[in-house]
């Protein structure tokens, strides 16, 4: 548990049970584990929004897919594909195939690794990790909970990475400073990128794979991301509020398959995160994530991500102003979407002028809920198990 604004680690647990030795193995700082879908946000969608000109409304087709080098990602339900999918939906429901597509076709694994290292992840190996499985958390050396939590804290802190520290200073008996542990800080992403990722990860908690992590005080905003590896060897939830960031890892040192230990309780790590945050935030004032001035809200076509025309199925989405669409969708109609007050002056273009799409937000979002999400990336990463139904394998 850390304060994202200062880098101070406020609480840390290195394991369960009685501590019997000094300087014993600390799983929070020393154990490197496969991160699963927790990597999707920071290895794929962070660089996609920050450097590749994409937006939360950018789309790809969720369909059977093979990368040029022969890698085949699958969603948790290998026979379930959702068709046209936005980046927001891919994050919310932890969708593997389209995430891999965005990494391979737009971001590139090399750029993903650069962003990870800029977020304080020290275990990356470019020669071994710069491949398609990176987007689903398939890496050679794993990652520590401390570093992963620190990476997400940068998103919570408006894009500014602050090195996690366990002490602030050391004084001698007279109060003189012997060691002043000032954390290293730098900008890791644009503030607009951080806010857009936060907005998408709020959906993870409100209706996606992270719903069991919803805290009791709904007046305090909350965002986060789930992660699961093959056969439930590792279960992750890393999330944050405007006050604090926390990361939870569940697993065994010997990678025992928790599929057979947890029964159907695949959400225990999310519930633990919620319980901890409920206690930590007791008595805190309601607070939301503050939207920066370089973000705007637009109504766009749910298929193309362009400004909506009358024939489009539409969604309302947030954009960084420098990547917001400026062209109108011409795929569905030539009649541009306008406010009702201006409708009478619109150019008719297509005489059939289907206007049924202009009056409501009829998006192409995944209505199947958590069943569309999850990880099943092959040898290194597994699936997200989501939602309030603890028996759901998604």
Identify the meaning behind each predicted range.
Residues 30, 97-99, 131-133:
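Short, solvent-exposed beta-strand edge segments and adjacent coil->beta transition regions
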Residues 38, 84-88, 144:
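Short, structural beta-strand-to-alpha-helix junction motif
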Residues 1-3, 9-34, 141-332, 336:
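A penicillin-recognizing enzyme superfamily signal
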Residues 7, 44-53, 65, 92-96, ...:
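Sec-exported extracytoplasmic/periplasmic mature domains
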Residues 53-112, 161, 173-203:
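Conserved catalytic neighborhood of penicillin-recognizing serine enzymes
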Residues 73-75, 106-149:
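Mid-domain, small-residue-enriched loop/turn segments at the edges of structured enzyme/sensor domains
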Residues 331-394:
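Ser/Thr/Gly/Pro-rich low-complexity, disordered linker/stalk segments of secreted
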């Amino acid at each position: 548990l850390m304060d994202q604004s200062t880098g101070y680690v406020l609480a840390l647990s290195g394991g369960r049970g009685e501590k019997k030795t000094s300087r014993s193995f600390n799983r929070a700082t020393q154990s490197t584990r496969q991160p699963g879908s927790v990597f999707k946000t920071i290895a794929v969608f962070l660089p996609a929004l920050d450097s590749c000109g994409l937006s939360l409304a950018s789309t790809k087709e969720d369909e059977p897919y093979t990368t040029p080098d022969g890698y085949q990602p699958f969603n948790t339900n290998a026979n379930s594909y959702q068709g046209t999918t936005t980046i927001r939906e891919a994050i919310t429901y932890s969708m593997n195939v389209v995430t891999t597509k965005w990494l391979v076709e737009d971001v590139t694994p090399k750029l993903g690794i650069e962003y990870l290292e800029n977020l304080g992840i020290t275990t990356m190996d470019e020669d071994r990790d710069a491949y398609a499985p990176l987007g689903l958390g398939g890496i050679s050396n794993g990652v520590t909970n401390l570093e992963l939590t620190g990476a997400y804290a940068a998103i919570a802190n408006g894009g500014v990475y602050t090195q996690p520290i366990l002490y602030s200073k050391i004084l001698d008996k007279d109060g003189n400073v012997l060691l002043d542990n000032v954390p290293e800080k730098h900008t890791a992403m644009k503030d607009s990128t951080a806010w857009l990722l936060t907005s998408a990860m709020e959906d993870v908690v409100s209706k996606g794979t992270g719903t069991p992590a919803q805290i009791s005080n709904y007046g305090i905003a909350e965002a986060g991301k789930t992660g699961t590896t093959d056969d439930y060897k590792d279960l992750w939830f890393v999330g944050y509020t405007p006050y604090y960031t926390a990361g939870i890892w569940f697993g065994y040192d010997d990678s025992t398959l928790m599929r057979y230990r947890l029964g159907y309780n695949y959400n225990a790590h999310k519930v633990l995160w919620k319980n901890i945050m409920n206690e930590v935030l007791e008595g805190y004032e309601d607070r939301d994530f503050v939207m920066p001035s370089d973000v705007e809200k637009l109504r766009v076509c749910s298929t193309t991500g362009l400004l909506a025309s009358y024939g489009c199925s539409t969604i309302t989405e947030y954009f960084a102003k420098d990547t917001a669409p400026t062209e109108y969708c011409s795929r569905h109609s030539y009649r541009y979407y306008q406010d009702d007050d201006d409708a009478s002056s619109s150019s008719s273009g297509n005489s059939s002028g289907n206007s049924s799409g202009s009056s409501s937000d009829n998006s192409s979002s995944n209505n199947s809920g958590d069943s569309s999400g999850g990880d099943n990336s092959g040898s290194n990463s597994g699936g997200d198990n989501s939602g309030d139904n603890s028996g759901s394998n998604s």
